[in-house]
């Protein structure tokens, strides 16, 4: 759904409405990324011992994110908003390359479709979050916080095991980060829209 009808002048969607959309979208992205990870895990990762290698290998690990709800509640909403933006921005490149490189994997039609959908929806969520930040802190240019990704060569390795592990790790991280964003947005909505009464 477009935020405003095309050609509408001075259209302003309420903050509550923007948060509703952002929370729905982030929930959708998280459920898609979980499905994609689970399908990939079942089809390609069985018996390869990927999980034991995948711990703490996410490119967004350099962004300090709260580990649980209690920690997240200690963070000022402005910092939490910027953190969500930073994590979303950090996924722009990897998602773009995931969409093109996943097509090299044999018999992965479902994964390809989900990757394309996630990449599109992630862009929408980032746009929505920029609108939210613009309303919460008008006129303030948020810092360009993000974590660069250098994993493209690993998605293009000739060795199939290494290449599949690189995909596995990326999908594992996407599921992890989309879950964090989903939780942070619910927390922010509760705090900024419902005055913590939820």
UniProtKB/Swiss-Prot annotation:
Keyword list, A-Z: Disulfide bond, Hormone, Secreted
CDD domains associated with the record: prolactin_like
Pfam families listed in its UniProt record: Hormone_1 (PF00103)
Matching InterPro entries: 4_helix_cytokine-like_core, Somatotropin/Prolactin, Somatotropin_CS
Chief location of this protein within or outside the cell: secreted
Gene3D superfamilies: 1.20.1250.10
Expression by tissue: Pituitary gland.
GO terms under cellular component: extracellular space
Name by which UniProt lists this protein: Prolactin
GO biological process, one term: positive regulation of receptor signaling pathway via JAK-STAT
GO molecular function, one term: hormone activity
Localization (cell): Secreted
Taxonomy, superkingdom: Eukaryota
Record-annotated disulphide pairs: 4-11, 58-173, 190-198
Family: Belongs to the somatotropin/prolactin family.
């Amino acid at each position: 759904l477009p935020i405003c009808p095309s050609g509408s002048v001075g259209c302003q969607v309420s903050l509550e409405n923007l948060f509703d959309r952002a929370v729905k979208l982030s929930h959708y992205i998280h459920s898609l990324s979980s499905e994609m990870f689970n399908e990939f895990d079942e089809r390609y990762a069985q018996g390869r011992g990927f999980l034991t290698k995948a711990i703490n290998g996410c490119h967004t690990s350099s962004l300090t994110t709260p580990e649980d709800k209690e920690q997240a509640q200690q963070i000022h909403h402005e910092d939490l908003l910027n953190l969500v933006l930073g994590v979303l921005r950090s996924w722009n490149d990897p998602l773009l390359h995931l969409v093109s490189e996943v097509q090299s994997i044999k018999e992965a039609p479902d994964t390809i479709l989900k990757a394309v959908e996630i990449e599109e929806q992630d862009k929408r969520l980032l746009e929505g979050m920029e609108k939210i930040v613009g309303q919460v802190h008008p006129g303030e240019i948020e810092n360009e916080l993000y974590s660069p990704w250098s994993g493209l060569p690993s998605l293009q390795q000739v060795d199939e095991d290494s290449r599949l592990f690189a995909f596995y790790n990326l999908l594992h991280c996407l599921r992890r980060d989309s879950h964090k964003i989903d939780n942070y947005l619910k927390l922010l909505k509760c705090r900024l829209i419902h005055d913590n009464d939820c």
